C-alpha cells in the first residue's frame, strides 16, 4: 500500500494497491459480438478525503475519471460507466467472469450527501447514515449492473455500470476490486427501448459524429456489419418569421461551406408539441439531419416544458426511444429584433469566415471560480478550474486567467479588462442567477460594457439559472446580444452553455470536464464544432450521473 498526499489546497490522499503514483481506471475490450461483449477493468487504488461527520473523522473515497454514486445515506464510493453498442432489440444481462480484490481494514467511509442544488451550501447538508450502515455486508453487493438501454441516433446502446469499490460498514473494510472481467451477454430479443427501424441501409455520419462515437462506445470499432458513409450532416433552422430575412445570410453561408441547410418559419412548424412533431417528421424523412437551430426568444419560440423546473431545447432533438440522448444536436439564437438577429449572425459569420487564426488572443482563455464547495472528487470549484486550466494549457492555450473568489478576489473591472483582451474559451464554475455570476457580482450590466470587438469567447458556465430564458434578458442572452455602441461591432460571446435550472454541485462538473477534454483531443484532419463539443459533453452527464435523472442535461 502506498500513500501520497495531494499537493493541492485540499486534503486528498492517494492510497495505492501496488503503485506509488496515482493511476486511473483502465478499461479494455476483450471481445465484442452480437451475442456477447467482454470487458476487462483494472483499478490501482483510490483517493481518500477526510471529512468531519457526527461520528468523527471519516473519509470520502474517489478516483480519477470516475463518478460519485450520489445515493444519499449510502457510503460515498465511485462508480464507472462503460458505454457499449448493443443489438437494436437485444435484452442483455451482466455477469462477473473473474475478479481479484484487495481489502483495506479500519477505514471509515462517510455517507453520501446526495445530489442537491448549488443554492445549498454542502457544509449545511447533514450526513445521514442509511440502513446499509447497519448491515454486515459489502455495499454495493454487485460489482457490475446495466443501466437502461438508450438510442443515440445510429445505435442502440447501454451503459455497463462498474463498481470497483465495496464497503462493509460493520467490519470497516473497503474492498478494492483490482481486476474485473465482465461479460454482457444477449439473452433475448425482447429488450426495452428498442430501435424499431433504421432510416437507411447505410449509416451516414460526419467526421465529428464518428469521433464522438469512437470516444463514447468501447466497441464502436467492432461494428463491421454496418456500412459507413461520410456526410457533413444537414441543418434545419426553425425561425420566427419576422427574423428570417436577417438569418438568410447564415443559411447561404452554411450551404456554401458544405453543410446543407434549410430554414422554415414558426408559422409552418408551430411551437411546443406541434414543432416536435414537425422535427420528428423531418428527421424521419432526412437521414442526414444532424443539427437543429432555433431562432427566437421565450415568448415566441419557447423551450419545451419537461417538468415544473425543467424547460428544454434539447427535448426537440430527442427523436428515438424513451431516453434523453439526442439524435439531433439543438442550439438557439435568442433574438428580440431583426437587428439583434443580424448582430448574432455577424458574430457567427466572422468566427467561421473571417477570423485571423493566427491572432494571439485565440491562445488565451478565462477561468472564473471560487473557493467554495466540495464538488466532484471533493474539489472546491477553483481546484476544479485549475484542472481545466491544466488541460487547456496542454493544448493550444498559452495563457488562462484565474479569477477566483476567496483566493485572489477578482473585481468586475478585472474581468472586464480580461474579456476585452479576447479569449477563445471561458469556463465558469460557482454560483449564478438569471442575470449574472456570483464571482465579482459580474452581471448583464458588465457584459454590455465590454469592448471586445469580434474577440469573442465561447462560454461553458456551471451555475444556476444563467440560461433562464423567461427572464427579461438572462445572462446567456446578454452575452449573445452584446454590441459595442461606439463602434457597432459585436461584443460578448459567440456562443455558450448556460443552464435554465438551479444546477446541482457535481453533475455539471463532469460535463464541463468532458467538454474541455473533447475540445483538446487531437485527431488528424478533424475540426470540432463548438455545438458538438458542448452537447456531446452534456450527454456525458447522463452516463456519469444516473441519480440526476437527466435534469442537468435536459436544461443545459
Q: Model-derived features: where do they sit?
A:
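Extracellular pro-sequences of secreted precursors
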Residues: 10-268, 273-291
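Bacterial Sec-dependent N-terminal signal peptides
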Residues: 1-13, 549-551
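Catalytic-core segments of thiol-dependent peptidases
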Residues: 279-308, 371-373, 377-473
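Active-site-proximal beta-strand/loop segments in catalytic clefts of secreted hydrolases
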Residues: 163-165, 238-242, 264-269, 294-298, ...
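Catalytic cores of nucleophile-dependent amide-cleaving enzymes
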Residues: 314, 318-352, 357, 434-511
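Active-site-proximal C-terminal subdomain of hydrolase catalytic domains
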Residues: 299, 369, 467-556
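A domain-level signal for caspase-like cysteine endopeptidase catalytic cores
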Residues: 235-263, 326-413
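Loop/turn elements at helix/coil->beta-strand transitions in domains of secreted/extracellular proteins
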Residues: 231-235, 256-262, 286-291, 355-366, ...
Amino acid at each position: 500500500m502506498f500513500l501520497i498526499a495531494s499537493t493541492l489546497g485540499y486534503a486528498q490522499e492517494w492510497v495505492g494497491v501496488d503503485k506509488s503514483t496515482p493511476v486511473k481506471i483502465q478499461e479494455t475490450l476483450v471481445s465484442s459480438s452480437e451475442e456477447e461483449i467482454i470487458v476487462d477493468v483494472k483499478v490501482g487504488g483510490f483517493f481518500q478525503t477526510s471529512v468531519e461527520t457526527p461520528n468523527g473523522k471519516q473519509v470520502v473515497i474517489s478516483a480519477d475519471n470516475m463518478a460519485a454514486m450520489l445515493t444519499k445515506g449510502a457510503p460515498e464510493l465511485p462508480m464507472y460507466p462503460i458505454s457499449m453498442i448493443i443489438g437494436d432489440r437485444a435484452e442483455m444481462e451482466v455477469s462477473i467472469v473473474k475478479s481479484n480484490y484487495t481489502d483495506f481494514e479500519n477505514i471509515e467511509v462517510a455517507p453520501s450527501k446526495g445530489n442537491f442544488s448549488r443554492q445549498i451550501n454542502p457544509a449545511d447538508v447533514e450526513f445521514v447514515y442509511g440502513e446499509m450502515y447497519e448491515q454486515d455486508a459489502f455495499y454495493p453487493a454487485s460489482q457490475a449492473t446495466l443501466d437502461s438501454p438508450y438510442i443515440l441516433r445510429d445505435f442502440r446502446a447501454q451503459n455497463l455500470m462498474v463498481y470497483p469499490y465495496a464497503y462493509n460498514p460493520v467490519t470497516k473494510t473497503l474492498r478494492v476490486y483490482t481486476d474485473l472481467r465482465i461479460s454482457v451477454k444477449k439473452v433475448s430479443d425482447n429488450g426495452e427501448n428498442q430501435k424499431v427501424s433504421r432510416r437507411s441501409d447505410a449509416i451516414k455520419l460526419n467526421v465529428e459524429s464518428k469521433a464522438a462515437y469512437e470516444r463514447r462506445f468501447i466497441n464502436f470499432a467492432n461494428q463491421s456489419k454496418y456500412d459507413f458513409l461520410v456526410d457533413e450532416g444537414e441543418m434545419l433552422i426553425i425561425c420566427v418569421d419576422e427574423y428570417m430575412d436577417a438569418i438568410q445570410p447564415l443559411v447561404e453561408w452554411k450551404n456554401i461551406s458544405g453543410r446543407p441547410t434549410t430554414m422554415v418559419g414558426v408559422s409552418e412548424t408551430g411551437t411546443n408539441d406541434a414543432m416536435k412533431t414537425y422535427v420528428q417528421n423531418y428527421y424521419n424523412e432526412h437521414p442526414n439531419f444532424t443539427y437543429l437551430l432555433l431562432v427566437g426568444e421565450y415568448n415566441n419560440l419557447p423551450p419545451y416544458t419537461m417538468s415544473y423546473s425543467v424547460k428544454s431545447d434539447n427535448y426537440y432533438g430527442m427523436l428515438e426511444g424513451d431516453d434523453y440522448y439526442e439524435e439531433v444536436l439543438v442550439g438557439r439564437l435568442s433574438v428580440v429584433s431583426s437587428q439583434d438577429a443580424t448582430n448574432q449572425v455577424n458574430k457567427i459569420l466572422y468566427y467561421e469566415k473571417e477570423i485571423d487564426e493566427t491572432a494571439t488572443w485565440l491562445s488565451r482563455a478565462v477561468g472564473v471560480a471560487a473557493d467554495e464547495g466540495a464538488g466532484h472528487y471533493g474539489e472546491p470549484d477553483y481546484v476544479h478550474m485549475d484542472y481545466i486550466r491544466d488541460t487547456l494549457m496542454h493544448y493550444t492555450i498559452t495563457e488562462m486567467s484565474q479569477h477566483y473568489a476567496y483566493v485572489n478576489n477578482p473585481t468586475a473591472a478585472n474581468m472586464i479588462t480580461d474579456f476585452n483582451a479576447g479569449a477563445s474559451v471561458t469556463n465558469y464554475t460557482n454560483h449564478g442567477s438569471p442575470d449574472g455570476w456570483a464571482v465579482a457580482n459580474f452581471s448583464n450590466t458588465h457584459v454590455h460594457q465590454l469592448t471586445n470587438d469580434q474577440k469573442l469567447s465561447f462560454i461553458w458556465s456551471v451555475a444556476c439559472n444563467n440560461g433562464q430564458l423567461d427572464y427579461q434578458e438572462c445572462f446567456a442572452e446578454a452575452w449573445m446580444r452584446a454590441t459595442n455602441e461606439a463602434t457597432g461591432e459585436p461584443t460578448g460571446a459567440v456562443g455558450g452553455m448556460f443552464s435554465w435550472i438551479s444546477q446541482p454541485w457535481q453533475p455539471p462538473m463532469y460535463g464541463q470536464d468532458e467538454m474541455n477534454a473533447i475540445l483538446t483531443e487531437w485527431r488528424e484532419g478533424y475540426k470540432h464544432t463548438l455545438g458538438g463539443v458542448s452537447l456531446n459533453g452534456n450527454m456525458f452527464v447522463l452516463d456519469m450521473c444516473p441519480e440526476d435523472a437527466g435534469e442537468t442535461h435536459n436544461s443545459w
